[in-house]
Amino acid sequence: MNVSTTPYQNARLLIDGEWVESQTTEWHDIINPATQQVLAKVPFATAAEVNAAIAAAQRAFQTWKLTPIGARMRIMLKLQALIREHSKRIATVLSAEQGKTIADAEGDIFRGLEVVEHACSIGTLQMGEFAENVAGGVDTYTLRQPIGVCAGITPFNFPAMIPLWMFPMAIACGNTFVLKPSEQDPLSTLMLVELALEAGVPPGVLNVVHGGKDVVDALCTHTDIKAVSFVGSTAVGTHVYDLAGRHGKRVQSMMGAKNHAVVLADANREQTLNALVGAGFGASGQRCMATSVVVLVGAAKKWLPDLKALAQKLKVNAGSEAGTDVGPVISRRAKERVLGLIESGIKEGAVLELDGRNIKVPGFEQGNFIGPTLFSGVTTDMQIYTQEIFGPVLVVIEVDTLDQAIALVNANPFGNGTGLFTQSGAAARKFQTEIDVGQVGINIPIPVPVPFFSFTGSRGSKLGDLGPYGKQVVQFYTQTKTVTSRWFDDDSVNDGVNTTINLR
C-alpha cells in the first residue's frame, strides 16, 4: 500500500488516479471516539475539486465501458485478495476512527469483501436475454450496458462495508465512480480505495471527494452524474432522493430504521437472549439493522430479568481493548443526543431497567461511552420508540399474541428489518407472510442478506425500487437495451410495404 493513505495522515482527494492535497480552507478533525485524540484532518472539497473528480470519471468512462468484462472481473479478483491480505491493518484503523471493537471492524470489512467476491462473477450477472425467431426470421435480445458516472455517499457506521457495497459493483458493471465517504471516519475507506488502485482500477474510474452538504448537493445535481447511492439518516436520505431525482438521476436511498425482534415463549431461551443482547448493543447500537425494540409475547414477558442480567455482563471499553463488547458512540454530539433520548424515556414514564448514562471507563475517561441501557413499560408514543436512537439502548414492549406483535411492527413507519424467535414453523410462516418489513430473520437477529441476494429494506427505511448489491444493484447500475434484428438472404422474397405494427 502506498504511503499516500498511511493511517493518521490527513485525508486526501483522489482525482484521475492521483492523490491530491485539497486547496480548501475548510478542514474537519477525525477524532478517536474513545480518547478524543485527533487522528488526522479531512478536507471539505471545493466546488472546483468536485467538478474535477466528476470530469475525470466522465473521461475515464469512455474507455472503461469498452474494457472487456473479463478484465474487469480480474481486477475484482485481485481486489478481494488484497483486502484479505490487509484486513487486520484496516480493522485497526477502522476501530480507532469509528470506535467499534477490532472483531466488529473485521466483520465490517468481511461483509464488504463478500460483495467484492460477488462482483468477481459480473460476467454472468450482467448477461442479457435472447429469444430466437420471435417473428419470421426476427430475433430479440437485451444488452445490459453501463450507465456512466455514478456517485456514492456513505455513512460513519460502516466505513468499510458500505463503500464496498457500492463502488466494486458499479465499476465491475463498466461505470465510473465518485465516492464521498463519511467525514467522521474516512481513513479506513481510503485504505480500501488504495487497494482498488493497486488491484488495477485505472485512473479516473474511481475518485474520492470529501465534504458536507455542499458536496452532497453537487453530486446530486451535476449533469454528468447518472446515479446516486446513499446510506445514512432519513433526513439526509430523503433530501438526496428528492434532489437527485429532480435532476434526473437514478437514486437508491437506504435510511433510518426501528427494528423489532418478536420473541415467542417457545423460542430457545439461551440462544434468543444472546441474539437480542448482541444485536441490540453490538457496535453501540449504531447499526441500521440493530435490534432496537424487543417485543415479548405472552409467557415470554417473564424473560425480562434474564435479558437485563445478560446485558449487565457486557464489557464497555475502547474498541482496541481485548474483551470489549461495547465501544463508544461516534462523537460527543451523538452521545448527547442519545442521553437526551434516555432522559425523554424517563420523563415519559418508561421504566429504566438498566442505566448506562454514567459509566466510567478507566484510562478512557474522555471517551463517548454509554453503557447498555434497557427500558421496559414502553408505549408506542414515546420518543424512545418513535425515533431511531442509534445508541446502546434497547426498549421492551409486551403484547399477548403474535397477531398483536405483527400489528405493532406493521404500524411502525420503518421497514428495514425484523426478526421472530420461535421453534414453531407455523408461527414463522405466518410472521414472514404477514409482516410488512423488507428483511425478515427467523431466529436471526440481524437479517442482512448475503450478496447473492440484495438488501431489501422497505417503507420508511428506503427510497428507490432497487437495493444495494446482488442482482438488484446490477439492474441499478446498468441500462437495458433491447435489440430486435432481422437478416435477409440475397434470395429472400420481398413481402412489400408493411403498414401495420405486426412483425412478419
Which stretches of residues belong to each language-model region?
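Hydrophobic face of amphipathic alpha-helices that form TPR/SEL1-like repeat modules
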Residues: M1-A34, R357
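Residue-level signal for inorganic ion chemistry
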Residues: Q36, R72, L94, V116, ...
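Conserved C-terminal structural/oligomerization subdomain of aldehyde/semialdehyde dehydrogenase
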Residues: Q37-A40, V201, I225, V262, ...
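Glycine-rich loop-to-alpha-helix module at the N-terminal edge of alpha/beta enzyme cores
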Residues: Q37-Q126, G137
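Short, well-ordered beta-strand elements within core beta-sheets of diverse protein domains
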Residues: L39-A45, A60-L66, G152, A261-L264, ...
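Structural signal for hydrophobic packing residues in well-ordered secondary-structure cores
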Residues: F61, K65, Q80-S87, A91, ...
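Rossmann-like NAD(P) dinucleotide-binding subdomain of oxidoreductase/dehydrogenase enzymes
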Residues: G128-L273, V399
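ALDH superfamily catalytic-core signature
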Residues: A235-T379, L402-D403, I442, S492-V493, ...
